[in-house]
């Protein structure tokens, strides 16, 4: 995660503007830096010009243009240390985990508490040996 005193930066990607806004507000209230994109293609573009480290990719799975799984693959190639947290109202966790065993899926709709717990889980898993 970001160093002590520097908040983690999260790239938030969702094609639903309402979900993006809700999620952004919660993350900012928790002290995170948030950059956002409305789809995977835009996220790749944003990440390519963002000079600072991005600690977490928080992405919807089902999106037009570039879906969340392809986005994560691209981001991991460009930024190997990035953590990924998937969100979906459609994808079964078992299907995602079968293909990507290390993945964490946040099922939509979610509460602020569930969102923060999932984000903390991702960062906690980073700190495990």
Model-derived features: where do they sit?
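Acidic catalytic/metal-coordinating carboxylates
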Residues: 38-42, 66-71
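Receiver (REC) domain active-site loop signature in two-component systems and cognate sites
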Residues: 63
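Acidic, metal-coordinating helix/loop segments flanking the phosphotransfer/catalytic sites
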Residues: 36-56
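Active-site residues of response regulator receiver
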Residues: 60
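Non-catalytic signal-transmission and effector/linker regions of two-component phosphorelay proteins
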Residues: 1-11, 24, 48, 53, ...
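Charged docking surfaces used in two-component/phosphorelay signaling
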Residues: 21-29
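A Lys-centered signature of the CheY-like receiver
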Residues: 108
């Amino acid at each position: 995660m970001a160093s002590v005193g520097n908040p983690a930066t999260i790239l938030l990607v969702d094609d639903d503007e309402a979900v993006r806004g809700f999620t952004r507000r919660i993350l900012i209230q928790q002290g995170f830096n948030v950059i956002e994109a409305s789809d995977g293609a835009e996220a790749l573009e944003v990440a390519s010009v963002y000079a600072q480290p991005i600690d977490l990719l928080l992405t919807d799975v089902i999106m037009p243009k570039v879906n969340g799984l392809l986005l994560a693959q691209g981001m991991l190639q460009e930024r190997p240390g990035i953590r990924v947290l998937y969100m979906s109202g459609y994808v079964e966790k078992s299907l995602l985990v079968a293909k990507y065993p290390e993945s964490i899926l946040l099922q939509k709709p979610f509460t602020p508490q569930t969102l923060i717990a999932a984000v903390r889980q991702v960062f906690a898993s980073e700190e495990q040996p």
